[in-house]
Protein backbone atom coordinates (compact mmCIF):
# COMPACT_ATOMS: atom_id res chain seq x y z
CA UNK A 1 0.00 0.00 0.00
CA UNK A 2 1.17 3.52 -0.76
CA UNK A 3 1.15 6.35 1.76
CA UNK A 4 1.15 10.04 0.94
CA UNK A 5 2.63 13.13 2.56
CA UNK A 6 0.68 16.04 1.12
CA UNK A 7 0.48 19.83 1.10
CA UNK A 8 -2.86 21.62 1.02
CA UNK A 9 -3.49 25.32 0.52
CA UNK A 10 -6.52 27.13 1.89
CA UNK A 11 -8.22 28.92 -0.99
CA UNK A 12 -9.56 31.88 1.06
CA UNK A 13 -6.62 32.41 3.44
CA UNK A 14 -3.57 31.05 1.62
CA UNK A 15 -2.60 28.97 4.67
CA UNK A 16 -0.78 25.68 4.17
CA UNK A 17 -1.36 22.30 5.79
CA UNK A 18 0.91 19.25 5.68
CA UNK A 19 -0.50 15.82 6.43
CA UNK A 20 -0.11 12.09 5.85
CA UNK A 21 -2.66 9.53 4.67
CA UNK A 22 -3.15 6.24 2.90
CA UNK A 23 -6.10 7.60 0.89
CA UNK A 24 -5.45 11.03 -0.58
CA UNK A 25 -8.88 11.61 -2.15
CA UNK A 26 -10.75 10.65 1.02
CA UNK A 27 -8.51 12.81 3.20
CA UNK A 28 -8.95 15.90 1.00
CA UNK A 29 -12.71 15.36 1.12
CA UNK A 30 -12.55 15.14 4.92
CA UNK A 31 -10.60 18.40 5.16
CA UNK A 32 -13.24 20.13 3.05
CA UNK A 33 -16.32 18.67 4.75
CA UNK A 34 -15.64 18.34 8.49
CA UNK A 35 -16.84 21.01 10.87
CA UNK A 36 -15.21 21.92 14.16
CA UNK A 37 -11.74 20.71 13.22
CA UNK A 38 -8.72 22.97 12.84
CA UNK A 39 -8.65 22.65 9.06
CA UNK A 40 -12.38 23.36 8.66
CA UNK A 41 -11.82 27.03 9.58
CA UNK A 42 -9.97 27.67 6.33
CA UNK A 43 -11.84 25.52 3.82
CA UNK A 44 -12.01 24.94 0.96
CA UNK A 45 -8.58 23.36 0.62
CA UNK A 46 -6.81 22.52 -2.62
CA UNK A 47 -4.12 19.90 -3.07
CA UNK A 48 -0.81 21.51 -4.01
CA UNK A 49 1.30 18.38 -4.14
CA UNK A 50 2.28 15.12 -2.51
CA UNK A 51 5.04 12.57 -2.05
CA UNK A 52 4.50 8.80 -2.21
CA UNK A 53 6.05 6.52 0.42
CA UNK A 54 6.01 2.72 0.53
CA UNK A 55 5.38 2.38 4.26
CA UNK A 56 3.29 4.16 6.85
CA UNK A 57 6.35 4.56 9.08
CA UNK A 58 8.36 6.33 6.37
CA UNK A 59 5.47 8.66 5.54
CA UNK A 60 4.86 9.46 9.20
CA UNK A 61 8.56 10.20 9.76
CA UNK A 62 8.58 12.50 6.72
CA UNK A 63 5.45 14.34 7.91
CA UNK A 64 6.93 14.83 11.37
CA UNK A 65 10.21 16.05 9.90
CA UNK A 66 8.46 18.60 7.66
CA UNK A 67 6.28 19.84 10.53
CA UNK A 68 9.21 20.11 12.93
CA UNK A 69 11.84 22.76 13.40
CA UNK A 70 14.54 20.75 11.61
CA UNK A 71 12.38 20.49 8.48
CA UNK A 72 11.32 24.14 8.30
CA UNK A 73 13.71 25.10 5.48
CA UNK A 74 12.85 21.98 3.47
CA UNK A 75 9.12 22.58 4.01
CA UNK A 76 9.39 26.16 2.76
CA UNK A 77 11.38 25.06 -0.30
CA UNK A 78 8.90 22.29 -1.13
CA UNK A 79 5.93 24.67 -0.90
CA UNK A 80 7.77 27.29 -2.95
CA UNK A 81 8.51 24.79 -5.72
CA UNK A 82 4.89 23.57 -5.73
CA UNK A 83 3.61 27.15 -6.03
CA UNK A 84 6.04 27.89 -8.86
CA UNK A 85 4.96 24.74 -10.69
CA UNK A 86 1.30 25.69 -10.25
CA UNK A 87 1.92 29.24 -11.52
CA UNK A 88 3.74 27.91 -14.58
CA UNK A 89 0.63 26.03 -15.57
How should these model regions be labeled?
Residues 1-89:
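Structure-specific nucleic-acid interaction/processing domains
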